[in-house]
Amino acid sequence: MENNNGNSVINKSNDKNSNNPNYMLLDRIFRLQKHNLSILLSNNNNNNNNNNNNNSNITIQSATNYLNELLNCLNELLTKFQSKTFQSPPQPINTSSTQTNYNNQNNPNPNPNPSPNPNSNNNNNNNTHITIILSTEIIIKILVKFCSVLPMDINYHKISVYGSPINLSLIQLPLKLAQLIVLISRYQNSITFNDHPNELEQLVNYFLYIIKPEKQIASSPSTPSTPSSSSRSQQQQQQQQQQSSSSSLSSSSSFHNVNTNLRIESLKALSSLLHNNGPNITSKLQQPLIECLIELSNYSDQSIDQETKRIAIVSLGNLCMQCGTKLSKYYIQIYDRLSLNLERVTSHINSDKYLIKFTSSILRSMQLLITQAKGILDQKSKSLYNILKTLMFYGVNISSSMSSVLTYQYQFEYSSRKKKQLQQQLANNNVLNSNSNSSSGGASSSSGGSNNTSPAIVTSASIHNSNGNSNENEIEKSTGITSSDSDIDERYNLSKLRFLTITLLNTMAKHSPKVFFGYWTLFLPSTPFPLTPTVFTSMTNDPDIKIKIVAANFLQTIIDGSKDYLVAINTSNHHNHHHSHSKSITTASPIMSRLNLNDNNNNNINNLNSNSFTTFSQNLTSILKEIHNGLIMILVQDPNYILPAFHQQILRCVSTLIINCPYEKLNMPSLLTSLLSAISPYIQNRDHSIQLTSLICIKQLFDITPLSPKELTPVLNNNNFIKIILNFLNNNNNNNNNNNNNNNNNNNNNNNNNNNNNNNILSNTLTSSLINEPNQQHQHQQHQQQNQQHHHQHQQQSLHFNQIEYVKIECLQIIGALTKHNFTILLEYIDLVYNILISILKKEISIHNSSGIVNSQQQQQQQQQQQQQQQQQQQQQQQQQQQQQQQQQQQQQQHNNTQNINNISGLNESSIGNYCLKTFEEITKAIQDSHKNNNTDIDYKICEKEFWNLFFLILPSLTVDPYPQIRASICNIFSNIGSKQFESMTKNLQMHLVSVVLGLIFDEQHIVRASACRSVGILIKIDSLHDDANFLSNSASCLTKSMGDVNINVRIKACWSLANLCDHLVSLKSKQELLFNDIPRQILSKVLESLLNSSFDNPKIRSNVVRALGNFARFADKKVLYNLNETSTFCKINENNNQNYNNQNISDYFHSIGGFNNLMNGVGGGGGSSSSGGGNGSGTIIPTTEEEEEKEEINIENKQKQSLPPQFSNSITLKKDSIILDRIVDSLLKNAQEPSSSFNFVKVKWNACYALGNIFYNQDIEFPNDDNNNNNNNNNKWLPQVYSTLITLMKSCKNFKTRINATSSLATPTHSRRKYGPFYKDVFEAVLESLSNINTVSDTSEFQYRDNLEKQLEIALIHLISEMKSNEIKSFDNCFFQYTDIIVNSFQKHQIILPIPQQPLPTSKTSSSSSSTSSEATPYLSSSVPPSIVTSTPSTTPMISSSNPNTSSLPTSERPTIKEYQKALEIIKEFCQNHNNIDTMDDTQKLHLSQLCLLFDFSESNYQDMYSKLQEVHSTGKSSH
């Protein structure tokens, strides 16, 4: 576009383009070169000197011509943009708002240029009907070009306007450039410099040099930088000052006016440049820019013009937009300046228009700042909230009655809006007429102007006049309202002030909810809200509907996310809550008068209940009640007085309140019932949006905060609510379709008119926008207009259709919520509900069949054909160029629109069907719950029977539905079937159900496959299918294939179902071993192989894999566990075991894992040569010799490693030299030793610990004998690792659930002494150590599992003592004496769990009765062992007493068992007998020994004194130490 020298490089190949005036103007701009214009100022100062030579005259003449050329280019470019000949590309923001702002704000319209170019003006008049949209890059280049050629060595603030016409022309250069930037940005909303940060820096620097205060501007001469010229100019200025003082006064005033206007226009341009471009400002430019703007925005500085301060504040806000943390170190400075200005302005605010506008600008900039500066309100928000509450109600008479305010509101809203538009049009017409009739120019009141007028240089008279009425003109520039509209103007400014105040509060509540929570009492009512001004005051008394809506939005923001804060509410009755006040608010405008009152009056108004004390939790309760009452009061008002937009926002507030309010703590069902009664009439509203929002609120009432049937039934009966909901579902369209169609037609006409005004040619480059002929441009505009009309009509139709469908969806969700929580209410209408839901599903199926929806393969073929056709069309269209491209765009848009409508309708229909099936899911859950609760009501049985009859009739058509959500819902419905429901079905229906679920496992969509896998895992638990070996075999085979699915959700559900299957197989083998043997061994082999392959998959999968592997290790027999080739990937297949069946399943399985098709085809095809041994046509692998067999296995293993999916890359199942048991244990150990501490991996660890305990339940697993450990050492290499891993986890794992499972695995009921082997002592000491450290909890969240862990450790201790041998008791003396208290407490705690027998404990050598000891034990006890001390506390009661506790309610499966406990007592008794005659024990050991004796004998009472003395000795010994 432009070369390095600044010359234009536009292609001139087209002669027509070279004669185009638009092209000529742009070419002239890009050909401009920089000249030294400061010589004109020096020549102007030395105009009395006659010694100028000819060379200087030539230079001055060239500079003058260059100055005129610059002004001509700027004026013509301004005219082009004003007449919309040139336009910038609009942003995706609504352009109507930007255009209205553009028309409302006025810039000074200068006088005509003294030396205009007549040719350019004529050409412009001939081509004003052509609109050319310039790209953003070209606009930026134009602006940068002007910025580079304009002089930077001139101090514009010191130029004398009356000095000469040249001075006046020089000062117009930056003024015109600023006006051009503002004009461009108003249409485009902002000029984006994301890809042009250097250009932005150049423009900002230019205007920053102009707007800097004189204190900051460096001393720069107004003439060329030479000492002679500067001295001469100073002498001449002194002479002029001495000659006439009056002329100096006039020149100084004009100088001040020029300085002010130039700075204001430059600030406007800078503000436009900074809008949304803050992140593009370089770090070097940030500090000087912010310092300059902060200084100019100082409200206390009287030397700065008021409008300058206001626009500087606006610029600060625009600078903060989208900056994030880039300006974090400057946010505090900006906030301090804005807050200080806000405090000073509001301290003496009155009806002055400028003060109101200035306050509004501060509020807007502060909002933009708070959105970016996180945490800035944590320390600097105390005084701000009080000021904002004051401004919320500024200009509102809050003492007005409710009805009068509502009536006045809408009369003003509609009539004043029309009146304002008419007055604006009249004002613009008057301005245009005055401009055309005025001969001397003057100040124009419209920046847009007329197409026949062109902006030029502003004269001194116009500048002086524009500043004479500064306050009025400043208002007119920004709003376009004349003085005749003063009443409307004042209302508009006050409404805007309140609007921005509430918007700022909304932003503060959204970005700092914790800080704002402390100020709830300022803005929310704790008493009936007419007494105190709150947010409800704005919602009810404000005359502007926009403020009502934004106040409701503010209330919604306050409530949203407050659920955690509202937990602290207190519903206790507090006294003195309602008080009678001696004084009431009767002033006409108490909020306005508050600004002029002192702080004492403010406190009196804000704290009306200061005489009583209530806690904050009680205030929260009162606030919630008043919020409900206020919303209900607004909803109950006559809807004719309330606009739909406000009603919709109120309903959104209600929805947010229902979600966040803790109704269970309020314990006030009357609030919910009254709220439901207030919302119910809106479900029949004409507006679909209000109707939809009200249905959402009711759904949340039924679902999130369900009412009881007693509370809900009267409200539903009074409003006929259920019948209305069912009518919505039964009717295709609502009753208000005609009204909606009329509204749509009106909207279409309005949109068509808007489209007619925007006939634009989109172009990305300047050449493409200039090459097209005018006729081609008009044709293209017509085609675009037609396409937009068709597209808009389709959008309106689809939108209307969507609204009706969304209403039906919400109705279905309401029925589902009623079914979930209050199914008894819906039983009265259950027949009608069934008929409506089935009819919706049938209608959907018929629509799918009639529309010709095909499978995914056919769709892919059609897409490929369409792509080929499009490619052919593109090749043909390249030859025909633009016309064919336009036709193609039309066809594609029409085709896309029709496809979008079809897709939208299909998706909506599928969603309706999906929600119908979700409602069926809730019905099946309710029926299942009734079976669990043993509900014998006949209505439930009839409802259940009718449902399944209807559902199975429509089931065949649902299974072939093209939408996966519907097929997945079928599986979810079947997952809610219980055992009784399944048994009540006929055999045909049972077979149909199972076949459908198993068939959907192989669906094309992963959503359906995952749901089907989950359903299989639930069906396995049904009693009728427990004994079905075929079902179990088929389920195992299908789930095994799903374990290799690509989608992770499918693998998670399949693995969970496989774990359930393995759980069932464990119980099946123990109870029905014959039925267990009917399951094919090959299927179990595939299950094990898939589990081992998945043991290193995603942690969500591994948590179920380790559970299934533990169960498998529990029920597998010895032949499977100690086999090397049982689960090898390519196992040998015996010809006697159904070759064809097995080969088919294996090929399917390997196909599901992926990568084995070539090998299986090579084996079974019989045609190709294969290094793996050839094929015989039957699919079996028959190696010829042993060497070929080894080679074959090596090749198979290599191919398998290359073909496994990524999740199996770390699998250990490829080891051939390991037995199955070693591979299972190795997998479990690696999962138990997982170092990650995330929740998913922790779940893997505790399931792996539980699975390791299942190994000790299998009696076929060989453990080493004490006599011959070396013989079986090869079969249990994993045993040391198992014990060391479990001991480590039991002692040091942070997660207590993992420690609990590790402890239970170390002491299973089948854990014999032989299974512990040499690790018995390590386990015993580890359990005692863990019990001693049970109170050391590192994570407080684990404290809830502390008691369960202690109980499990005590059970493990009793079991370990019971398995102790007699010959090794002496080796544990230190443990018994060191941990005596722990052992005694463990036995005492479990005396409630253990049933106490009537007979004494049987022993092999001794026997004792309940009243005396045996003959062998009597001398032992009578010599040295003290008996028990009987106390009244349960904790010290002996384990075995003469009176048995009541154990009828205790479960028999609790541990420790009687056998374990008896053996443990025998070991303790034997330990005490071994230390009976030992005289070397100290007193502490004797005390511990006596405590142990309490566990089995307490009958001797002669040793009470001796035992008490031992206790005294023990206590004195502790005190002495």
From Swiss-Prot:
InterPro entries: ARM-like, ARM-type_fold, DUF4042, HEAT6. Keywords: Coiled coil. The keyword Coiled coil applies. It comes from the Eukaryota. Residues 853-903 form a coiled coil. Residues 1-20, 85-124, 218-254, 431-482, 735-797, 1398-1455 are annotated as: Disordered. Residues 94-108, 219-254, 431-454, 465-482, 735-762, 775-788, 1398-1453 have a biased composition (Low complexity). This is Putative uncharacterized protein DDB_G0272456.
